[in-house]
Amino acid sequence: MTSLRFVITATLLGSTIGAPAHAHAAAQWKTDFDKHTVPLDEITSGGPPKDGIPAVDRPVFVSVAEADEWLGDREPVVVVAYGGETKAYPLQILIWHEIVNDEIAGLPVSVTFCPLCNTALAFDRRFDGRVLDFGTTGKLRHSDLVMYDRQTETWWQQASGEGIVGTYAGRRLTLVSAPLVSWKQFQQEYPEGLVLSRQTGFSRDYGRNPYQRYDTRKGPFDHFFSGRKDGRLPAMERVVALAEADSSVAYSMSALEDRPVLNDTFSGRPIVVLWAPGTASALDASAIADGRDVGSTGVFGREIGGRVLTFESAGPGLYRDAQTGSTWNVFGRATSGPLAGQRLDPVPHGNHFWFAWAVFMPHTRVES
């Protein structure tokens, strides 16, 4: 339970844990350090050793009713829906483990969260004809989690899904849609869903935020961030972040709070970006359930049945399309009207801190 606190305490005390991570790494790694796509001196130690922040490899799930005994209505959860199954991964657990290796309806996935970057992302673990299992290296690059796969010990940048050191350097993992929403929203939308339980095999103070007030800072810890800060937005602004091929875009979440629907075109595809109130920041108050409201987001293709829909707000957490007058929710489901029951196709996205998106996607388009 002390490993995460050590990261923060060491940083604040100005320790030397920001030293190059590869300097003494060879003995504990089978990684090919001669193969890399980034300068090795950009990778620094975050404090904990290899697997010092332990991934959850044997996740246990409970019902919505059971999880409701220990989850607050506004607590953030990562949602993965695939093949008729839906699971919620509470940030109160991910904040202590950062990686959950799981399978949903036969699809091997890794659900990940880097608290220092607010990056909650899920990846398809099928890669190059095998299934990868991921762990934490104990390293950071530009303040972001560097993961490794246990099959080749390639190091992967969590915020981008890119292999940066080792066998798969230069290759990318495939994102799986994993929106970050409130527990109450998940309960209402998926009452029969499953929830990652606190039965992780580890003793942690689940529900407590070890990064208290982190997201009220003006920027990331200097020890862990050596990149250029992009002044187009405040460093700790949350953005809805999308990338595909050579295109990327970031939508300011504070702007979405004022205008909760944005119709756009990304990479040639008509999309809609939705924002809804009611989700707590996991990186604010000491108790995650008490964090300030930062909202939840959904991103979807807005073409259905061969026609492109245009959306507008229909009240907090509700949206209406101009073509049919159907009402939709933040999960992209029509709740009433001619299209009731239909769902829009989700577009994988993250709710990154701006500094963490801009440093990896410096040419990104910004909508603020």
What are these regions (language model features)?
Residues 1-5:
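Positively charged n-region of N-terminal signal peptides that target proteins for export
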Residues 22-368:
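Mid-to-C-terminal functional-domain signal that highlights helix-capping/loop sites
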Residues 7-16:
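Bacterial N-terminal signal peptides
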